[in-house]
């Protein structure tokens, strides 16, 4: 199989995977958080068995593992991990991909709905002039994060086997619910994944290698106000919506994702829901440096205490969950 044939096979594999809706559900506490991830797991299980891998299993959390014995002695064993869920951003779970040879400029993804991807918003497009790019029709995410990673792992296994390439022991793991806080990876049974070192294969730029991650925390703040009719509200009404906005106002706009880069830490106000009685704010905390990360968590706690002092009649509860840590 030459390079062009390999690339075509990879594209076809990717298109077959994105046709399987496997969005994770951030509202669910189950693991996997969506039934659709089971469908993806079964497809990968069948593929690994077809390749002839050993010890192919799907556990109770839809984690798929397999083992390819080495054909070379005395070399390190390596693992490859890829998450099989895609993110739910409120768009359609059904993906309608299209392959477009990009010739520059803005691209119309959906003429009927007047959906465009514009160079002004995505200047990285211009790096791929003259190349085929896989887009959606604009009604969904594509799911390249991480169906592209899954496709590459499966394609690499097929090439190793069909071309009898030399390799050491290889183990693979496909995990659910990365998008909801690395929940699948956290319960991966390492007794089924004994390797000297491993790589996570995930969505990113061509040739990109990430050697560390940030510390990640998730703060949830629940605010209960005091309701009354606005005609008799003076001195009585405590509006949780305004308390939530006051809380957010304690944070610098310069320390948000849209104003930071590289190893800058930040606060991401990811979700807010409110009504006249209650409000909820979710703040994602990110920082590479351990001391700065701890300081950011303290800042959130102190900001909550400050608004509680400002509004003593309100009931404010908060907590910070550790999502993952920087293991550089």
Indicate where each model-derived feature is located.
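A generic structural motif
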Residues: 86, 140, 227-228, 285-293
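Active-site metal-coordination/substrate-binding segment of hydrolases
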Residues: 75-166
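Phosphate/diphosphate-binding glycine-rich loops and adjacent basic-rich segments that engage nucleotide
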Residues: 199-233, 237-243
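A non-catalytic alpha/beta surface segment that caps or lines the substrate-entry region
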Residues: 29-75, 79-81, 85
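Predominant activation on well-ordered alpha-helical scaffold segments within soluble catalytic domains
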Residues: 11, 15, 42-45, 150-158, ...
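N-terminal capping segment at the start of a domain
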Residues: 7-35, 135
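Acidic/histidine-rich catalytic neighborhood of metal-dependent amide-processing enzymes
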Residues: 125-214, 254-256, 260-270, 281-284, ...
